[in-house]
């Protein structure tokens, strides 16, 4: 769910991702590890500094030179002149705030943050707006603004690193003149997963072009480099104040368009070169699944269209819908990872074939209801998902009573409402925060057989209420609602 202010609309707001300092550092170090650059060429995250007058005078000339080189690398010709500007940290911060306000209204950003809370992706009450402003102000190295058709670079970036920033962002400028990148990304709306896939094409292709720029004169290209495992790189993203306090999901979401997109772009480049990658703009990927598994893009796999019935009548007039969208394979991998770990999450999410989720909020109490329907690749995969996601739900909700389990139905009660998981065929529905009667109404609207009845039992003995021990990690990774 691109990030300026995010990776996924579900969690944040979509805007073309500005180039971050840590991306420069990780990319150069990764290339150095591959034996392509010398240690002197591998940059580290630069510290804040003011540009000298001489550097300002050289900036435009350097940008023009790099722009010509990127045109030659990508095969995209410059059609109209491009504005180029150095920006101070205060100017970058003002730009971030302006873009955030233009992209989504406060109520929309509130809804997106609450939805991320509902999935357990960010802690309850996490100030997402402030965090993203601080992070982007701290980390932006440069950006291309499609609306203004202007390239900005941070004036504190050392001269040695400016050309690396230029290579990435000026690739976007060239792409915009040929493919109108902002309109191209937004054409995927309202499908957040498809929009993130398009963001990943933009960032991944610009990463590939930046690497080819770094490799000029070596006789090598991005096609010659080893595959990237983004999960390894994410572990290096804790060196700055804002990143240190970032929830794991946000770190993953920040890096995915760059390095997930780079893996996809490199796969496309190998047989066809840059003309083949440009053709992706005419036939964009349909989901993050196609970014994660480029062979599925090549085969033309189309995600299943998954729907959910209206919940308004079942919930009542005092509930407001906050979000109604898709998570995609990337989103579900992140949800599962919070509670099951990276390896299990990756395997389970790979069986994704389509999904839909809705989030509702009660006006007075601010309680939430989360309903998610997931289509798996087969009934066997649905059964596997049922077994492991029921475990995830137990980890997510520390205090629970009346736990009830059958082969395809699982439920328990929490202080904030019932939690239900039901699988029928290859479809699974997860329902958190409402009563059994509302869940039964949903099942009826789906045309599913009635779920098993929970046996009547005496009032629970408080001493036997299952309570998961609370730790600092569990409180931040799996907030209760």
Region spans (language model):
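Active-site recognition of the HExxH zinc-binding catalytic motif
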Residues: 70, 164-181, 206-207, 378
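Short, compositionally biased low-complexity segments enriched in polar/charged residues
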Residues: 111-146, 312-370, 380, 385-388, ...
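Auxiliary, metal-adjacent structural segments of Zn-dependent hydrolase domains
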Residues: 61-151, 155-160
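Post-HExxH zinc-binding segment in Zn-dependent metallohydrolases
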Residues: 66, 176-233
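Short pre-active-site segment immediately N-terminal to the catalytic Zn-binding motif
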Residues: 151-167, 194-198
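Pan-zinc metallopeptidase signature
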Residues: 238-368
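Acidic helix-start/capping segments at beta-turn-to-alpha-helix junctions
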Residues: 79-99, 190-193, 224-233, 283-286
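C-terminal soluble interaction/assembly domains
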Residues: 356-475, 479-481
């Amino acid at each position: 769910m691109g990030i300026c202010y995010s990776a996924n609309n579900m969690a944040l707001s979509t805007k073309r991702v500005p180039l971050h300092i840590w991306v420069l550092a990780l990319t150069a170090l990764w290339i150095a590890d591959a034996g392509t650059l010398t240690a002197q060429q591998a940059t580290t995250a630069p510290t804040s500094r003011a540009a000298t007058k001489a550097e300002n005078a050289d900036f435009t000339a350097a940008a023009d030179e790099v722009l010509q080189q990127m045109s030659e690398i990508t095969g995209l010709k410059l059609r109209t002149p491009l504005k180029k500007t150095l920006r101070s940290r205060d100017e970058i911060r003002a730009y971030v705030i302006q873009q955030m306000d233009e992209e989504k209204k406060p109520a929309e950003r509130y809804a997106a943050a609450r939805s991320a809370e509902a999935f357990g992706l960010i802690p309850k009450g996490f100030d997402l707006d402030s965090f993203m402003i601080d992070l982007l102000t701290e980390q932006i190295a440069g950006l291309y603004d499609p609306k203004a058709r202007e390239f900005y670079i941070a004036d504190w970036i050392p001269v040695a690193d400016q050309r690396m920033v230029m290579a990435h962002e000026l690739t976007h400028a060239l792409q915009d003149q040929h493919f109108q990148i902002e309109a191209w990304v937004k054409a995927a709306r309202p499908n957040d997963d498809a929009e993130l896939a398009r963001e990943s094409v933009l960032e991944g292709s610009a990463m590939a072009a930046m690497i080819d720029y770094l490799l000029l004169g070596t006789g090598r290209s991005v096609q010659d480099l080893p595959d990237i495992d983004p999960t390894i790189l994410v572990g290096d993203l804790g060196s700055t104040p804002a990143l240190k306090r970032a929830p794991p999901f946000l770190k993953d979401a920040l890096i995915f368009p760059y390095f997930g997109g780079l893996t996809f772009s490199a796969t496309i480049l190998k047989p066809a070169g840059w003309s083949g990658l440009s053709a992706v703009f005419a036939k964009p990927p349909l989901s993050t699944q196609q970014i994660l598994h480029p062979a599925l893009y090549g085969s033309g796999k189309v995600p299943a269209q998954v729907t959910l019935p209206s919940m308004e009548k079942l919930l009542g007039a005092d509930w407001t819908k906050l979000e109604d969208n898709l998570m995609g394979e990337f989103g579900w991998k992140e949800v599962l990872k919070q509670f099951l770990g990276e390896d299990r999450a990756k395997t389970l999410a790979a069986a994704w074939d389509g999904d839909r989720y809705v989030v509702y909020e009660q006006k007075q109490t601010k309680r939430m209801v989360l309903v998610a329907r997931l289509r798996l690749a087969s009934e066997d995969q649905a059964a596997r998902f049922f077994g492991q996601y029921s475990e995830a739900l137990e980890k997510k909700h520390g205090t629970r009573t009346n736990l009830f389990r059958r082969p395809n139905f699982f439920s328990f009660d929490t202080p904030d409402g019932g939690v239900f998981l039901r699988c029928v065929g290859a479809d699974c529905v997860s329902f958190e925060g409402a009563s059994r009667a509302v869940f039964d109404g949903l099942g009826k609207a789906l045309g599913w057989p009635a779920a098993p009845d929970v046996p009547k039992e005496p009032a629970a003995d408080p001493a036997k209420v299952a309570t998961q021990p609370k730790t600092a990690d569990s409180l931040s990774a799996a907030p209760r609602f």
